[in-house]
């Protein structure tokens, strides 16, 4: 993962962790956890692409690779919808900027994961 994406993830996670949403901190903590999980998954796919031979061992170790990939895309779609919803309801400019950047990052990561998965298939 390039350094800009890493710093974007870190920046957004840090800012989201400081936010106090009116609805529920549990919802936000869930989003943060999914962001972190998505980052780790994206990193592991990127590493597998770099070492194409490892993909075969990944498939052997994990016969449910495609199922996991499908699940990650569902998580991304859920996060995108959740971020869009938060963006619509928030009036705080700090939160709006954070959620706009989170949305942009999610769309970029979705594109990267798609590209990696096509290379691995």
Swiss-Prot record:
Positions occupied by motif Nuclear export signal: 12-21, 85-94
One of the GO BP terms on file: exit of virus from host cell nucleus through nuclear pore
One Gene Ontology term, aspect cellular component: virion component
Keywords of the record: Host nucleus, Host-virus interaction, Transport, Virion
InterPro entries given in the database record: Flu_NS2
More about this protein: Average number present in a viral particle is estimated to be 130-200 molecules.
Signal peptide coordinates: none
Protein name as it appears in the record: Nuclear export protein
Family: Belongs to the influenza viruses NEP family.
Domain of life: Viruses
Coiled coil regions in record: none
Recorded name of the encoding gene: NS
Cell compartments where the protein resides: Virion; Host nucleus
Pfam family for this entry, one: Flu_NS2
Reported function: Mediates the nuclear export of encapsidated genomic RNAs (ribonucleoproteins, RNPs). Acts as an adapter between viral RNPs complexes and the nuclear export machinery of the cell. Possesses no intrinsic RNA-binding activity, but includes a C-terminal M1-binding domain. This domain is believed to allow recognition of RNPs bound to the protein M1.
Quaternary data: Interacts with protein M1. May interact with host nucleoporin RAB/HRB and exportin XPO1/CRM1.
